[in-house]
Amino acid sequence: MKIIGVIPARYKSSRFPGKPLADICGKPMIWWVYNQCLKVKELDEVYVATDDVKIEEACKQNGINVVMTSDQHKTGTDRIGEVARKIEADLYVNIQGDEPLLEPETIRAAILPFLENDTLQITNLMTKIKDPVEVVNFTVPKVITNKEGIGIYLTRSTAPYPKGSIDYAYYKQVCVYGFKPEALQFYCEYGQTYGKAKIESIEDIEILRFIENGYKVQYIEVDSDTVAVDTPNDLEKVRKIVEDRKKAGTI
């Protein structure tokens, strides 16, 4: 099985323009993400997928495989789909370009189920919410699955709502995905024909396009507490963590 890791990277972010190139201890953020991916032995190849020449040039300067893609994509999954049309593989793993501290074992968790079950089409990760504030935070997608870990719904609301009991462990989405080529083809063709699916559009959660259309998304629980860089303040947190790890000799 040929497995490719793909890191979508946009320069034009509404909250933090240019963040893939933000400096972290002398290297652009995208370099840190890429190097975490290289530690995943199951990944045969890793690419950054971008529509920006500045990111392309930074990748080339830092020895990073890069694929130029259209600037018309509405989602990162659409960008992965274009890569799939250009580079053949049996499995594509979507790794977010704004999580430079993402652990290799977390990435592996999205891959391993495919090696044990060849009927799987899509995997996604989830982690238990430890901070109660995140349960009511609309920026945090909550995951609801059945007993087999198949996704039933994802929402930015508090769900399930604790009307009768608060004895429930809430989970949030970790944005690492595994896609078979056929699943990516469906996602892209649906988008070209219909645009975003109804619930996907309302919640603004990409994976709902699959769930709304009957695809089974296998969720895997991980113990992940990585820091996503959405703002300059997040970047400062990551810089501090990296600096501390370098001093401790753990990087």
Regions found by a protein language model. Give the residues of each.
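N-terminal glycine-rich phosphate-binding loop and ensuing alpha1 helix
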Residues: K2-A49
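Hydrophobic/aromatic residues located in beta-strands of well-ordered beta-sheets
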Residues: G5, V46-V48, Y92, T123, ...
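Short, high-confidence coil segments that cap the C-terminus of an alpha-helix
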Residues: L43, A89, D118-L120, Y215
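Short phosphate-binding loop-to-helix
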Residues: Y47, V53-L112
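A conserved hydrophobic position in a structured secondary element of the catalytic/binding core
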Residues: T50-D51, L102, F179, D230
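Conserved core of the sugar-phosphate nucleotidyltransferase
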Residues: L102-Y190, K196
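Conserved alpha/beta core of the MobA/IspD/sugar-nucleotide pyrophosphorylase nucleotidyltransferase superfamily
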Residues: I166-I251
